[in-house]
């Protein structure tokens, strides 16, 4: 019940923020029409070319805004996902900790050619939506986290990982980057970030519903369409994924845990100015469970309420 309540609270908050951003971006229009307007602004040259073009700018923002240190010269490639790995729109393939000289590749899946032309076009995200995906997968999401974890002195944290940490961190960076200046206050960029947040919110609620409350796949798909504003293709993919991956609630769960830890750790250490130091220390442990990192970072002297999720 506590897990579900935390997820519902964050879903409601993100919906409210989306309504506010849409009122600025498309005054007088419905939220649905606002989202359609954002989605219609497709990346120039297609989704792969668009994602590739976003990488230098995102890396520079990480550097200029002191988001986190970049501990190595590696960069991620961007390519179309192979046919056997198109069950999700995007993912990054990162070499294991014992590999050397192998590149990381950010893969993007094209729409299913068997879908209608309308559904294929709707599947391709808008520029702002894709920007949040690129943040998640590369800078400063999974790829930057990999650069740190492969250099950690913590062998256990380097060789073993947790779903909540890896996906929680990558999802956390989407909102954090916008809060830190990505988009310079452009409501379209905020809407793109919120669409990704709502997608993860509905994953969270679907995981609980499908596996503990008798929710059907059709009901999950409807929730993705109505609460996360997903097109048919993405909604059907996401609902189906929930049947075999109940752990996909860890995107939102991990993000909420990191937000709580960041707020607790930076209080008295400079607040927003300490985000870079927080991120470097957080990433220095490898990929262990977030509650263990919380113990290490806050120490025995921390006199907070003991909660690991925001109130």
Set out the residue ranges of the language-model regions.
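Long, His/Glu/Asp-enriched segments that create or flank divalent metal/ion-associated functional microenvironments
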Residues: 9-16, 34-311
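Structured, charged N-terminal subsegments at the starts of enzyme catalytic cores
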Residues: 1-32
